[in-house]
Amino acid sequence: MDTIEKKSVATIRTLSIDAIEKANSGHPGMPMGAAPMAYTLWTKFMNVSPANPGWFNRDRFVLSAGHGSALLYSMLHLSGFDLSIEDLKGFRQWGSKTPGHPEFGHTAGVDATTGPLGQGIAMAVGMAIAERHLAETYNRDSFNVVDHYTYSICGDGDLMEGISSEAASLAGHLQLGRLIVLYDSNDISLDGDLDRSFSENVKQRFEAMNWEVLYVEDGNNIEELTAAIEKARQNEKKPTLIEVKTTIGFGSPNRAGTSGVHGAPLGKEESKLTKEAYAWTYEEDFYVPSEVYEHFAVAVKESGEKKEQEWNAQFAKYKEVYPELAEQLELAIKGELPKDWDQEVPVYEKGSSLASRASSGEVLNGLAKKIPFFVGGSADLAGSNKTTIKNAGDFTAVDYSGKNFWFGVREFAMGAALNGMALHGGLRVFGGTFFVFSDYLRPAIRLAALMGLPVTYVFTHDSIAVGEDGPTHEPVEQLASLRAMPNLSLIRPADGNETAAAWKLAVQSTDHPTALVLTRQNLPTIDQTSEEALAGVEKGAYVVSKSKNETPDALLIASGSEVGLAIEAQAELAKENIDVSVVSMPSMDRFEKQSDEYKNEVLPADVKKRLAIEMGSSFGWGKYTGLEGDVLGIDRFGASAPGETIINEYGFSVPNVVNRVKALINK
């Protein structure tokens, strides 16, 4: 290690120490141990443009070990991103650009929100998938307009999480050679020595999953690190894991190599002793020697800007030779849709009857005909979820151009990979599974919502109507649970036209994910136009079948498959001179964003007798039914029997709805 390298690594370490000390909060051990690998990667290999952090063909970097955020912030500052010393001093403070864990969209240069361990690796896999698909789709002859690498730094905790195995298995199967993961192997976890809980042979595990595994014995050896990354970059047929042996809290005389340095500041005295161990002679905290700034300016900033300029020149020529492809790619990068994107979306007529999963399959195929960068897949349930794009090919290790992704029985990895694909940009992505298994990918949905990613989830088999498979496969609490998640839009459509509307809203999203909750059983098409359905779904709730009188005797509020039931019950109640209005409420979150005036139009304040009908938990419906209303829901688990039998046994029948309304009115 030469003098400038040594000084640069020491600067990264001391900046991280100082930020954590000032905040009196954070994780110094990982940045202190992993600083040399981050330095080597960023100054010798990473192509990034600090002045334009969103440059499309930049290398992607995911700090899967997100608790080491001080390391990333130090790298971003030194590299010339919009992150000042004052920002580093604001580490973990209210309103700062340097939150405790990296947040996408909050800090320039952060490519993914990380912190929940394991998900960063899986998002990096998604980014590598996106790079390969876009490269295969748009690269032509000598024009490699998409050809970057995806890098990640992870720790022991990441590799203990199950999602890392799911994602690594998928990456190896797909031969994602441009994915390189540096493993900060320091033999320490938060609770103590790693051998208390983790003793497997990581090398053999990853080799069994078709990864190349390299080993760096000394994590402080820049030459050794450089050679390993160079070798990894040469392997186009396998992703690479580079195990780098490090010492957590390197340089700390009393805490290096212990769990005590993982998640607590060093303290004033230990910080002083540690800096002395680095031969750091500067008294001032947050000090950066001018020669270190100059070194990073050349190695990262100027190098990256040159690469971006070369890419811009190449893309300008590409536009001349392949104008249509270039226009398409530019549209995809901007996240915009083609002008006629919804022209092939089907319209459903009264009299037809189709499961919403089936109409969803038709709609997504209509969208795929007009949106060339619309891609997705399923966690081994494509036939049931109806997520296959016809005549679009499969994304495989031998053909990355296919638009159908086979995630296998890896729901969590699918969710996180979709996040990575969305973060990468250039694609509109969706993924499907049974609604009950949304719990398997919930942490990835949460990160999608937190990052504001327009991912679409196709959740089918949405209720006890699943039938014979029984309570393990019948969702009950999932609707209420996902509705509680901020910035996730959940839509449960009542028929084909509402399903088409839901998809239209989902693909137009730019700042939130959407969960489509769809039936296995057929649903009758409601007597309204597709335009009326779109207008209603867009507002989250609307009167789908009016009462005869201006003020009804009662309101029936339902979602999904229960809207048809409510309309049937309305007709029966009319025979007994009970006049009710039926409200379809496919999306509570959308309805909550409407004006008070509109809400009162749909749910008149003077109509107190209200019955909500939904084959799921009653939790949350009280807000709309009020103290004088009632909920026909399910607050126990399902059962194994034919679907119609269970539906009737649980009270979702016209006679029971009629009786419940009568009971309300007679209260």
Curated annotation (Swiss-Prot):
Q: Coiled coil where? A: none
Name the needed cofactors: Mg(2+); Ca(2+); Mn(2+); Co(2+)
The cofactor remark states: Binds 1 Mg(2+) ion per subunit. Can also utilize other divalent metal cations, such as Ca(2+), Mn(2+) and Co(2+). Binds 1 thiamine pyrophosphate per subunit.
Record Pfam families: Transket_pyr (PF02779), Transketolase_C_1 (PF22613), Transketolase_N (PF00456)
**Where, in this chain's numbering, is thiamine diphosphate bound?**
H67, G115, P116, L117, G157, N186, H262, F437
Site annotation Important for catalytic activity: residues: H27, H262
Binding-site residues, Mg(2+)? D156, N186, I188
Name the cystine pairs: none
InterPro entries, A to Z: THDP-binding (IPR029061), Transketo_C/PFOR_II (IPR009014), Transketolase-like_C_2 (IPR055152), Transketolase-like_Pyr-bd (IPR005475), Transketolase_bac-like (IPR005478), Transketolase_BS (IPR020826), Transketolase_CS (IPR049557), Transketolase_fam (IPR033247)
Residues noted as binding substrate in the record, renumbered to the chain: H27, H262, R357, S384, H461, D469, R520
Residues the record marks as active site: E411 (proton donor)
Q: Could you tell me what reaction this enzyme catalyses? A: D-sedoheptulose 7-phosphate + D-glyceraldehyde 3-phosphate = aldehydo-D-ribose 5-phosphate + D-xylulose 5-phosphate
Q: Which GO terms describe its biological process?
A: pentose-phosphate shunt
Instruction: Give the GO cellular component terms, alphabetically.
Output: cytosol
Query: What class does this enzyme belong to in the EC scheme?
Result: transferase
Q: Name one GO molecular function term.
A: metal ion binding
**What UniProt keywords are attached to this protein's entry?**
Calcium, Magnesium, Metal-binding, Thiamine pyrophosphate, Transferase
* EC numbers: 2.2.1.1
What is this protein's function per UniProt? Answer: Catalyzes the transfer of a two-carbon ketol group from a ketose donor to an aldose acceptor, via a covalent intermediate with the cofactor thiamine pyrophosphate.
Q: Which family does it belong to?
A: Belongs to the transketolase family.
What quaternary structure, including any partners, is listed in this protein's UniProt entry? Homodimer.
PANTHER family from the entry? TRANSKETOLASE (PTHR43522), TRANSKETOLASE 1-RELATED (PTHR43522:SF2)
Q: What name does the UniProt record give this protein?
A: Transketolase
Whose protein is this, by species? Answer: Bacillus subtilis (strain 168)
Q: Which gene name belongs to this protein? A: tkt
